[in-house]
Amino acid sequence: MPQKTSKSKSSRTRYIEDSDDETRGRSRNRSIEKSRSRSLDKSQKKSRDKSLTRSRSKSPEKSKSRSKSLTRSRSKSPKKCITGNRKNSKHTKKDNEYTTEESDEESDDESDGETNEESDEELDNKSDGESDEEISEESDEEISEESDEDVPEEEYDDNDIRNIIIENINNEFARGKFGDFNVIIMKDNGFINATKLCKNAGSDFYHWKETKKAKELINELISSPGIKGDEVISTITGGKLTEIRGTYAHPKLIIQIAAWCSAEYALKVSDIVIEYHAKEAIEQKEKLLKKKDDKIDKLSKKIDEQKKEIKKLLEQGNEVLGYAKDTNRKINHVVNERVPYSDKPEIEHQLIIMKNNDKDKKQYKYSALRVMNKSKSSALSRYYKSHPKGNVILTIKYTPNSMHLWNECKDDLHKKKIKLSKKSSKFNLREDYTEKQLIKDIKKIHNARLQHPN
């Protein structure tokens, strides 16, 4: 009997342990399903947010394609969840079968439980990976489809008003940013919806159009070359797109309309115009300065050229002067045949060397008189008043020019043989130089210039 009771107790303990294992397996399956559903919800939210952000910048047709992709991803993900649940249900059946076995097989049950946990985790990872891959593939397909549907950007000139376009409405109209105004613009000509612009600023376009200033502007613009009357203002009515309805005005009129609507914009326009005129004035001043600089450069070039010419002329003049000096020197030494005697003896020159013989022994003992025949007597009388005891030691009765002859005598004798006065034609003999030598040298100089008969 005691043995039976022990067996019954052991069977009860095995039954309790088996039931505990069963509850553990069920709780584990529930936690796996919860974690898997959470991961799927997160992936669906991420894909939904991405698709929504793209749909905001695209047309309604593109949003439809993205909504289809979202529905596809939502419809696919539950299927994965169902397949995971089916696999988990299979594992729970196996766990229930293991609970009916004997307690001596508990070690096998524990190893099987661990493998079941690992297989469940692998299934979760696979299902999550497959759903993420599907979502990423679908999102990539959406992006490629959207990029193919984008309207190509058009290039305009730098001064074209259509550069303010930021997004297209369709092939004919687009949205743009005109200063602080959000505007609708025609793509073919750049006209801007004046009705919407005035309405956004709290004004009505027809009030501006009725003003005298508006009529003057429109008439002036119509009269401008290259602009037709029907090309200044255009009205769009009807159609499904209410956004594009209204009156569109030429860009030159839009600036005036915006200034009429908004005082702030009018002041901004004033600042721009002031800056433009200031720059224009500066450019004009710079042009004038440039013209003056160009004139100064031209004049300076002419001056430089004239300086070069003057330098050449000076060089040529110096050369001519050298030739003249050389010619004069040759004339002074010309031979007797080239200097004929004068036909008028009274104007012929004489050179007279006088010895002063003064009692007081003044500074200079000799004098040179350069006279013509007609003035010889008067010159000698003046000399004798100053030097009463003076006497003639040499007379050159004829010379073409007594001044030139005496100048040559001074050039040849004053350094080593005579000492000259700075104010007159008086002189002294240097040491070791006698009157005889003086007379001889003067005659030699005279004869070298002109060979006169004695």
From Swiss-Prot:
Q: Name one Pfam family in it.
A: KilA-N
Q: Where is this region: Disordered?
A: 1-159
**Which stretches are tagged as biased composition: Basic and acidic residues?**
14-64
> Which InterPro entries did the record assign?
DUF3627, KilA/APSES_HTH, KilA_N
Q: What is the lineage of its organism?
A: Viruses, Varidnaviria, Bamfordvirae, Nucleocytoviricota, Megaviricetes
Give the stretches traversing the membrane. none
Give the superkingdom in one word. Viruses
| Residue ranges with Acidic residues bias | 98-123, 130-158
Q: What is the name attached to this protein's record?
A: Putative KilA-N domain-containing protein L4
Mark out the compositionally biased spans (Basic residues): 1-12, 65-79
Domain (KilA-N): give its ranges.
172-276
